[in-house]
Amino acid sequence: MMHKNIEGDKVDIIKVFGGNVRKYRIEKGVSQEKFAELCGLHRTYISDIECFRRSISLDNIQKIANALEIETYKLFMEE
C-alpha cells in the first residue's frame, strides 16, 4: 500500500490556490484591499492566502471565485 505525503500535498494545493488567486486578481486589475472588499474578507487574509500562509474554508473559496467572476475549479488548476 502506498502512503501519500498528505502534508506535502496540502502545501502544494495551498501554493497553487494562492498563486492563482494572485494571478486572477492582478488580471482583474484590483489591489488586495479592493479585492478583499469585493470578497467580504480582510486584506491581510487575502495577503496570507497569496503568500501561502493560510488554509481556507470552502465558503471563502466560493467568495473569492465569485469576486473573481471565475469557476471555482480554476483556482486549483496548475499551469
Residue ranges and their predicted role:
Residues 26, 37, 66:
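Alpha-helical residues within the helix-turn-helix
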Residues 53-63:
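Short, basic-rich loop-to-helix N-cap that marks the start of a DNA-contacting helix
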Residues 61-65, 75-76:
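Hydrophobic micro-packing sites on short alpha-helices
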Residues 3-27:
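A short, Lys/Arg-rich alpha-helix, primarily the initiator
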Residues 22, 33, 62:
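Residues within the helices of the helix-turn-helix
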